[in-house]
Amino acid sequence: MAITEVFTHKQPLGNSDPAHTAYGPGELTASTPAMTPLMLDATSGKLTVWDGAHAGAATGILAVTADQNSAELAFYKSGSFRIEDVLWPSAVTDENIKRNAFAGTAISIV
């Protein structure tokens, strides 16, 4: 009996910048896949899904899938990521907003 595994290469890093993760309190409202941009909620101060309203407001990228029951979120706080690998909000279609979403942080979009 042979066990067959399927390997799918997933390399979201787009450059040689070191990628570091951190943990922070979150308040997701639904199941959220890894590689989703995050921002700080202005009222609670917790991490939530970036709304895409303003470039420079995103603070991190969700590192592992999480949901509304996840009190603490693992997220990338630094690194370079390919623009096509980040799960952008559907309302954000302007590439300039995507590339500058993390302005002022240690995250680069390439």
UniProtKB/Swiss-Prot annotation:
Gene3D superfamilies: Head decoration protein D (2.40.300.10). It comes from the Viruses. Residues 1-27 are annotated as: Disordered. Keywords: Capsid decoration protein, Capsid protein, Late protein, Virion. Pfam families: HDPD. It is found in: Virion. GO terms for cellular component: viral capsid, decoration. Putative decoration protein. This is Putative decoration protein.
